[in-house]
Amino acid sequence: MILVLLGPPGSGKGTQGALLKSELSFEHISTGDMLRAEVSKKSPLGLKAEEYMKQGLLVPDDLIIAMIKNILTEAPHKNYVFDGFPRNVNQAEAFETMLNTMRLQVDKVFYFDLEDDVIIKRLSGRRVCPKCGATYNIYYQKPKNDTLCDNDATPLIQRDDDKEEVIVNRLRVYKEQTFPLIEYYKYKNKLFVVSADGTQEEVFEKLKSML
């Protein structure tokens, strides 16, 4: 079975992908992790990808598709969940073409739906300890002292990409890119909408009921 998880930043799709791996033994494929792994092992595809990444450019779709094909070829009978890929209709079409050559297909696509104001709260409320890496949220998971880490009393920081104006822009870009993709999978009768409002356990139960 091949699943695709879609959803805006802060919708928790990465967490749900990790739960599918730990609870149901899916192989969880995040394209960011996959790219970093290929670069670190200096594979031929990784070396090509690194040339683009060093220049701050997006890695071309054909390289990403080739990496995914290598993973699937090694174990075509496993269950896979793709997190954050495809990102647009062009990638979805290239992915589908590649899967067809292997007599595989995307079985279901889950879109994690969440209101913008909840996403902004989830992300802009994040605070991180620069010393130990502990993460808090001033709305949902407060430290004992509002501004200090529970572990080592280091002042907490807000990362630049968690600032509200950055999040609003990320959401705008995400919608522009991804809404056509949602329509693409809806047309193919593969789209399932999951309400991402709730605890990660509650959302996972909803997801499992749709598998």
Curated annotation (Swiss-Prot):
Zn(2+) binds at C129, C132, C149, D152. Keywords: ATP-binding, Cytoplasm, Kinase, Metal-binding, Nucleotide biosynthesis, Nucleotide-binding, Transferase, Zinc. The keyword Kinase applies. GO terms for molecular function: adenylate kinase activity; ATP binding; zinc ion binding. PROSITE patterns: ADENYLATE_KINASE. GO terms for biological process: AMP salvage. Pfam families: ADK (PF00406), ADK_lid (PF05191). It is found in: Cytoplasm. The keyword Phosphoprotein does not apply. Its main location: cytoplasm. Residues 30-59 are annotated as: NMP. It comes from the Bacteria. Residues 125-162 are annotated as: LID. ATP binds at G10, S11, G12, K13, G14, T15, R126, T135, Y136, G198. Monomer. Belongs to the adenylate kinase family. This is Adenylate kinase.
